[in-house]
């Protein structure tokens, strides 16, 4: 099985695939009498005209490392953000697209409390909490129509830390 | 100072003011080869035509109980959801409206990992993490125009557990 090494998750490294949702610098502004910093509009949410943003909750079972990546999926009609409610780190596998085929895979692991937003139509592995089960708020598209494409990997990848 | 007692946070009790975002029953469907339950579209997101949903991050200082509630605010152009990334419970004070004046105050305290969505134009206290500072993903309205009304309480309330 081919190996895929986990690399450091930075906003720059992840930018082609989506957005890192975390405190990454000073706040855009202080609110609530200076007791709270607002880091404004951190994710490129993107939905088709028939869709809208919604908040759902994924209650996901634990996975372990090394992790066998045997399938990726994408959502042509909308972006998808994952926001951990239990502080459980999760694996984020993504890939570029070549005429409908995922290529040049990358793997990242969030730190506790970090969220990510995956761009509309970007190939990604399914939610994979590492080491413990976890609840995740998910901001994605609510609406009619087919918003899921799956691609089973002919040769699975072994994702390692 | 008048006292306001914290009451149990249930979806029913909070419904007039917003939505409780948590695992509250069986999932709407199982996804990811049965390894994840999806609890679908849990929040009444509501934005005016010029606004859209965005994900921001609030980095808020700790508060303590009892808590002095001396101001509430509301957002006429959009709902506002708070999703804890560090598992820090937070105080949720809300009130009904009587011709622009907040009345009949209520106070709730989330459990670790619970989020809430506050309905558009509903009076509420500012984000108040209890016992520790915390980061919260906030799904609220991004757009032009005035979306904040504040109401300083003539007589503050002492919120107690």
Swiss-Prot record, chains A, B:
GO MF terms held by the record: ureidoglycolate hydrolase activity; ureidoglycolate lyase activity
Alphabetically ordered keywords of this record: Lyase, Purine metabolism
CDD domains: cupin_UAH
InterPro entries in UniProt: RmlC_Cupin_sf, UAH_cupin, Ureidogly_lyase, Ureidogly_lyase_bac, Ureidoglycolate_lyase_dom_sf
Assembly: Homodimer.
Stated family: Belongs to the ureidoglycolate lyase family.
Function noted in UniProt: Catalyzes the catabolism of the allantoin degradation intermediate (S)-ureidoglycolate, generating urea and glyoxylate. Involved in the utilization of allantoin as nitrogen source.
Protein name: Ureidoglycolate lyase
Lineage: Bacteria, Pseudomonadati, Pseudomonadota, Alphaproteobacteria, Rhodobacterales
């Amino acid at each position: 099985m081919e190996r895929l090494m986990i690399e450091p998750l930075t906003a720059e490294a992840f930018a082609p695939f989506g957005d890192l949702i975390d405190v990454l610098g000073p706040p855009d502004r202080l609110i609530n009498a200076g007791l709270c910093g607002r880091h404004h509009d951190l994710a490129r949410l993107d939905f088709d005209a028939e869709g809208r943003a919604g908040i759902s909750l994924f209650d996901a079972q634990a996975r372990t490392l090394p992790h066998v990546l045997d399938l990726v999926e994408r959502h042509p009609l909308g972006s998808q953000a994952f926001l951990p409610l239990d502080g459980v780190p999760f694996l984020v596998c993504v890939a570029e697209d070549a005429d409908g085929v995922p290529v040049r895979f990358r793997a990242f692991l969030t730190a506790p409390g970090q969220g990510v937003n995956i761009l509309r139509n970007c190939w990604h592995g399914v939610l994979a909490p590492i080491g413990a089960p976890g609840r995740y708020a998910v901001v994605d598209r609510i609406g009619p129509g087919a918003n899921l494409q799956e691609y089973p990997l002919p040769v699975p990848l072994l994702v390692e830390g």
